[in-house]
């Protein structure tokens, strides 16, 4: 950052601090008991949790430069706003009626943000051929620019909004590489130079744009699109980043997001390189502390550690413990009747069970359904093989395995020690190779 930019930022913050604090008020129809309203500050990365009292949440603040924020109220609503340290804002929120309205000094910009019918590229557009997909993407951006220009917005905001709209409009563009073959049922697809050149043109590496939440989503997927070539994802990403991502802020942002997601979902086994890469490229104390905490949680789930135990109920009411299954390998499927991806794995699981029938492997289904009768009804159909057990939702086993998404597969050895805390799914070809290797021992 050059001296002029540093001085400009310092002057902007000093000016903001010298003003009386603006007040931001959110009036919520039918508030949810004990639910806080959250404000995510896009430039600073801070979060403000506001108590909602009698349907009203209020924040007075001026220690910031004007920036976009994302406001969340549980699952009831989410919205993008633009807050300025010297302009009051009141937002009336009726989530049930989908009615939102702003009043106060900052009303013009924010009514535009929450009420405008922004153009969005439909998922089905990925079925188009590259040239038509690019035209559709360009049309979305042009439509959003026209909408902005018709809104009579202040000039100081227009420049920022035009940049934000670029990333908002093209946010689906980097996903075309993976969505197109899926939509067209293609076994193989390699984008042409037409698509890749357009992507590179859009994917400007500038950490200052991280003040737009849309840029973070866009640039991460743009980097993934260019980096991933079907090999080891982490190795491909690290190589691409070192060669092409020179902006330190962007590199930190993508490294942190990717490494945290990988470790929090699949643990430490096999991820030594990405953990080291994180510590090489991320120095923000808050990010490092958060990452180190999730790494520490996974330490007890590394290969060779004794597995957390469970006791669950079969369809006849019999209690079955993990300890009673020792002596064979144990392949656990944590699932629920309502889970679409879980149901998608069932045919593959059935084939796997048939292929390894009579072998030294227990196949165990652990249901985390909140509705036990739904599980019972599904099991009573009689088409699910293996050991089917009901675990329920508030399970110590699930908490210790850090399960925050299903299906989750776990593989244990004959002594009840962990082989893989996040094992391959039945639909993945490498699961049979893993089983065959283990059964030779």
Predicted regions and their residues:
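Conserved redox-active cysteine motifs that mediate thiol-disulfide chemistry
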Residues: 326-327, 333-351
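N-proximal helix/coil linker or "cap" segments that precede and/or mark the start of modular domains
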Residues: 251-313, 318, 323-328, 354-357, ...
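Bacterial Sec-dependent N-terminal signal peptides
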Residues: 1-26, 438-440
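Thiol/disulfide oxidoreductase modules built on the thioredoxin-like
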Residues: 382-384, 391-436
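Structural microenvironment flanking redox-active thiols in thiol-disulfide oxidoreductases
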Residues: 344-382, 393-399, 433
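A non-transmembrane, solvent-exposed segment enriched in polar/low-complexity residues
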Residues: 22-160, 164, 173-175, 182-186
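Alpha-helical repeat scaffolds
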Residues: 185-200, 232-242, 269-279, 308-309
